Amino acid sequence: PKKSRYLDKFSLSILEPQMTGLFISAIERIDNGGIGSFFIEELAELENAEISYDKPVQCNADVISHLNQEQQKAVNDVLNRPSLYAIQGPPGTGKTAVLSAIAKMYTDSGKNVLVICNSHQAVNNALNKISQYKIPTIKIGNEFKTVSLNEDIIKFSTMRQYSSFKRRNRMPTGEVVGMTLCGAILNLVLHGNAFTPSIVLIDEASQIPLCFGSAIAALAGGTYVFIGDNQQMPPIFHENLETDPLSISIFEHLQKILPEEL
């Protein structure tokens, strides 16, 4: 069989084996030519993988007119479609406003947007902000975690329900789908659902462990945008791994390897 470029370069400490097969499967998918290999190379610092750029998304000046200069720069940087980008800022600096403006202009260009966060509440907050632009916005997840969502957001408990709805209804090109990180791994990585985003917006990235990098890469986004606050509560790790050098958030790791991007 073909030898992986990646699997022999990782050292695994397995204390929670339930996800092991999933992560190995994700790396193998990427190794076989799937979108995301650049991301794995960047995270693991395996090669000098340069950030690539796709055809830019057109900027709508009206959408960003209410943003300050730094926020507008972040939006415009992402509209240039880099393969990897990170936005850092403490609470109250308008990170969600930037996220929603990016989602608006991507969907206006007919491109799918995936929003993932560590918690349902963070997903709901992001989707509520995005839905103010009156664009197709969908939340997938536990129905008991949708109480705080705006009424115009379409809600599904499972990806199967969403897929069935799309088959029965003519959906516009370019929509926003939001779910938790665990939901994205189960629905889009493990089950290989057909939803393919042009961009993946990862909020609360400072709470996501670095080990989830391989699964996030397998979400097949052309652009990955990590949004976080380096002063926010870090991920919680198994007590036997608290001193491990890899027991950090994916956002903290990005700050170390790509300081010029933050």
Give the label of every model feature segment:
Residues 108-111, 118-119, 182-186, 193-262:
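Conserved helicase motor core of SF1/SF2 NTP-dependent helicases
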Residues 63-83, 97-98, 179-181:
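N-terminal pre-P-loop "Q-motif" helix
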Residues 123-125, 146-151, 233-237:
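Switch/connector loops and helix/strand junctions flanking conserved nucleotide-binding motifs
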Residues 149-177:
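Conserved motor-coupling elements within RecA-like helicase/translocase cores
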Residues 71-74, 87, 94-106, 122-126, ...:
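Extended, hydrophobic alpha-helical segments in both membrane/secreted and soluble proteins
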Residues 111-112, 135-139, 145, 196-198:
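Residues that mark the start of a beta-strand
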Residues 91-93, 98-130, 138-141, 262:
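Conserved RecA-like ASCE P-loop NTPase motor core of nucleic-acid helicases/translocases
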